[in-house]
Every structure is written in structure tokens, then in C-alpha cells.
């Protein structure tokens, strides 16, 4: 009896990963031996990993690297160039309106091809791909993920700096998961919009 092939590629080494050796984290496949901290190469567990732009770290070094630089733009090795995967319009008009099994990771409602954005193996409505704290619109280069909860870098840095660690960020993330209703991320406030413009180098006229 021969084993059937698989199209799954490890998110770290980009080599084929078979079911018996596969870990699926945030919708992405990994070899068990590749699920390691990028900084110290220590083996990671579901309970002790953090992710920045798809790059894995143990929580100890994720916190340490932030303290050394004061932000997440330094000392972090850049991950793979990963642009949001916008689903192409199907060639047949009828297929545009057909059913789909994809659920938005933020609101858990059905997401159709024309309104879908895909990041780290998760599907989102374009309108749901926002910071869980301030509601800022995110891009593939401006988001941080902690236990599958999305943040913009500005608010992720801000939440970290409040107490020097992200224990309270995890508590807030868990609270959001258990809250009833699965509401959408908050709309950005005026202050948040101004901060986002300043970060992008756009000034008010």
C-alpha cells in the first residue's frame, strides 16, 4: 500500500508536509520539527508561541526583542513576503453566487469570494480585517497576531508598553473570544484615524 501525496507545504521550510508529521497552526501547516522560535530555535507549543507577520517566536523572546528595541520594527527577521490573497473572480458568472464553506475568522459569518481576504490561512471579510483594539484597517505589513487575535502594530506596541508584558493583552483576547455575539471589531475612532494617518506620513491639511 502506498501513501497518497499531499499538496501541503510547510510554512517554514516550504517542503511537503505529510499528515503524520503535520501541525496546523492558525490554518497554516508546519512540520512538527519546524514549529520553532525563529530567534532561539526552541520547540514551540500551542500555549507558548507568538506570531509577527507569519514569523514564529516563543513568548520569552517575543517579549525580549520588543524590550530591546521598544517596537516591533527592529530585531525581528522579516518573514516571507506575504500579500493578502484576494480571491480572483471566477470565470463563470454563476460560480460567483454559488455557496461557500468559508467563514470569516473575525465574525464567523460566511465570506464570499468577492469580499474575501486571506491571511495566515484564515479568511476575513475585507471590512473585518481590522485591529481588535482600535478598529484600524490592517494590511499584510501592518498587523500583529497574538493567539489568532489581530492588532495593528501601533496598538499592539501600546498595549505592551502599558505593563511591560502582554499578559493583559492575552486576557483581553480571551475575553473577546468568550463574549457573546461575535461582534465586528470596533469602528476606528477619530483619534485612531489621526494616529493611523500620522504613522503613514499623511498630515491633516
Swiss-Prot record:
GO molecular function, one term: actin filament binding
Comp. bias regions, Basic and acidic residues: 194-205
Highest taxon in the source lineage: Eukaryota
CC per GO annotation: cytoplasm; cytoskeleton
Principal localisation: cytoplasm
Example GO BP: actin filament bundle assembly
Every LIM zinc-binding domain range: 8-68, 102-162
Subcellular location: Cytoplasm, Cytoskeleton
CDD domains: LIM1_SF3
PROSITE patterns (alphabetical): LIM_DOMAIN_1, LIM_DOMAIN_2
Coiled-coil spans in chain: none
Tissue: Predominantly expressed in flowers and in pollen grains. Detected in vasculature and roots.
Ranges where the record places region Disordered: 177-205
Extra remark: Cross-links actin with a constant of dissociation of 1.7 uM.
Subunit composition and interactions: Interacts with F-actin.
Free-text function comment from the UniProt entry: Binds to actin filaments and promotes cross-linking into thick bundles. Has an actin-stabilizing activity. The actin regulatory activities are inhibited by pH > 6.8 but are [Ca(2+)] independent.
Name assigned to this protein: LIM domain-containing protein PLIM2b
Organism annotation: Arabidopsis thaliana
Gene (UniProt): PLIM2B
Amino acid at each position: 500500500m502506498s501513501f497518497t501525496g499531499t499538496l501541503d507545504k510547510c510554512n517554514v521550510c516550504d517542503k511537503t508536509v505529510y499528515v503524520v508529521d503535520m501541525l496546523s497552526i492558525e490554518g497554516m501547516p508546519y512540520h512538527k520539527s519546524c514549529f520553532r522560535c525563529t530567534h532561539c530555535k526552541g520547540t514551540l507549543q500551542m500555549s507558548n508561541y507568538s506570531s509577527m507577520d507569519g514569523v514564529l517566536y516563543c513568548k520569552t523572546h517575543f517579549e525580549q526583542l520588543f524590550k530591546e528595541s521598544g517596537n516591533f520594527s527592529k530585531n525581528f527577521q522579516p518573514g516571507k513576503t506575504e500579500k493578502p490573497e484576494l480571491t480572483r473572480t471566477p470565470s463563470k458568472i454563476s460560480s460567483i453566487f454559488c455557496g461557500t464553506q468559508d467563514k470569516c475568522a473575525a465574525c464567523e459569518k460566511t465570506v464570499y469570494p468577492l469580499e474575501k481576504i486571506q491571511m495566515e490561512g484564515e479568511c476575513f471579510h475585507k471590512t473585518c480585517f481590522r485591529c481588535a483594539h482600535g478598529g484600524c484597517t490592517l494590511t499584510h505589513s501592518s498587523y500583529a497576531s497574538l493567539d489568532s487575535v489581530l492588532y495593528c502594530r501601533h496598538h499592539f506596541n501600546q498595549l505592551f508598553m502599558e505593563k511591560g508584558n502582554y499578559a493583559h493583552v492575552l486576557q483581553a483576547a480571551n475575553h473577546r473570544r468568550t463574549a457573546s455575539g461575535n461582534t465586528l471589531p470596533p469602528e476606528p475612532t477619530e483619534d485612531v484615524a489621526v494616529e493611523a494617518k500620522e504613522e503613514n506620513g499623511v498630515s491633516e491639511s
